[in-house]
Amino acid sequence: MAEFNNVSIAKAASVLFEGNITSRSIEFEDGSRKTLGIMLPGEYELNTVHTQIMDIQRGNLEVLLPAKEWVTYEGPTTFEVPANSKFKLRVHSLVDYCCHFVKNGI
């Protein structure tokens, strides 16, 4: 899907790691939510509450999921992060991403 229709977009950005990761939240008519953002090169550790499906549009990064080894991803690609977990990122080039939050079957 190249574009989203009939959505509400948060005006304010979520800014993490001194601006190295930024995103904007979008909400769909069915209540589901995604974020659209970028990650600049660096190393980061993030937490999840809900399962996240990370859709990498472009860029190169390595991901360390719980109880796994580092895996390299080159966009376009997708990977899943389990709910209630911490994961690490090594971002090697600007990453353009869309994150889908899976909760309550949505």
Ranges and model annotations:
Residues 82-106:
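Ligand-binding loop in jelly-roll beta-barrel domains
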Residues 48-63:
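Short, conserved beta-strand element in jelly-roll/cupin
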Residues 30-32, 68, 84, 94:
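Glycine-centered tight beta-turn/hairpin loop motif at sheet-sheet or coil-to-beta transitions
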Residues 22, 26, 35-46, 64-65:
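Compact, glycine-rich, soluble single-domain proteins
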Residues 38, 48, 65, 91, ...:
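Residue-level recognition of conserved beta-strand positions in structured domain cores
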